[in-house]
Amino acid sequence: MLKKAQEDPSNHYYLVIEELNRGNAPAIFGEIFQLLDRKDEDEFPAEEVGESEYGISNYDVAKEVYGDENHPVRIPSNMNILATMNTADQNVFTLDTAFLRRWSTRQIENNFEKSEHSKDMIDGTKVSWGTFATVINDMIIDSNTDMVSSADKCLGIYFAKKKELDADKFSEKVLKHLWDNAFRMDPTVIFNGSCKSLEDVVSKYETSEADKLESVLRTEVYEKMLLKMKQRNIENDEK
């Protein structure tokens, strides 16, 4: 890609890295780390703005890209690196300040109103995916106010796909996460007294002929979801 970008300056090229902090990024980038500093318009002429401020020596790369093994290797101005990362995830590497300062970062809001299927109903219930997740996330934050990792346990807008709202998939994917992770220390915060184990939750949810969520959630939690559903319906009617 570096060679293509170098030879085609009229077009933009993007290297996309998913979950950047899943690995030891500085170690993975190696000497390329130095190329992340780009020339600023306040300090360099227009024709140089955007390219790497500092070059590195790499004979093999230089020969392939420039045809000259002694040519300093730089990222051209028409090549950008885009990366995603979950700063709340506990099972990742911490990125040091020196590495992070070389990036322009943007916080992505976990807004269920932007989810394509937030208004889709969870199979066998009277509750939509967006309403369910919003109520649960509020409870996760409230019950983990003294824990830095509470955001890590929240449901993201892409946590469950539309097909995973089906009864046989929802319990195994979403309810399992709530039992095993989000409310691991005290599942009774959201699950009713008849659910003594995850097996009970899955079994009752999948076999219930009534509202499936009502069969496993605490009454006050379920009613909170119904109330939010009612409020959203009123808001939609007013629009």
Tell what function each PLM region has.
Residues 1-239:
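C-terminal regulatory/interaction module of P-loop NTP-utilizing enzymes
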